[in-house]
A protein has these predicted regions:
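Short, glycine/charged-rich "phosphate-handling" switch motifs in NTP-dependent
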Residues: 98
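Conserved acidic carboxylate
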Residues: 7
């Protein structure tokens, strides 16, 4: 399964990428929402993990644009974020996100959490 990971913090991006690769995923990484929109058509990911707060375009705007485009709307979006308050999670789900994973995340179980959200 191919994941597109959008995370602007290099250390978090590295840990998430290594954790997901160890869990058997193919991982493509980018640093912001604009880069997600630029590469989603060519990379054709099975799911997208989005950081909430990123430069240039945040995760919410990115998710909104992905879900508004018929070509990318079916791709599951999972937020990977420190902002997991109930109202913010509800907002993400209302935009069409499949779920949210809180930061800091457990590197040993990140891949399993992604699979659980995608299976729901």
């Amino acid at each position: 399964m191919k994941l597109l990971l959008a995370e602007d913090e290099p250390d978090v991006q590295l840990i998430a990428r290594l954790s997901l690769k160890k869990a058997g995923f193919t991982v493509v990484t980018v640093g912001n929402g604009l880069e997600v929109l630029d590469c989603v058509a060519s990379e054709r990911p099975d799911a997208i993990l989005l950081d909430w707060m990123m430069p240039d375009m945040d995760g919410f705007e990115t998710c909104k644009r992905l879900k508004a485009d018929p070509a990318t709307a079916p791709i599951p979006v999972i937020f990977l974020t420190a902002r997991v308050q109930e109202a913010e999670v509800a907002r993400a789900l209302a935009l069409g996100a499949a779920g949210c994973i809180g930061k800091p995340f457990d590197a040993l179980t990140l891949g399993q959490r992604v699979l659980e959200i995608l299976a729901a």
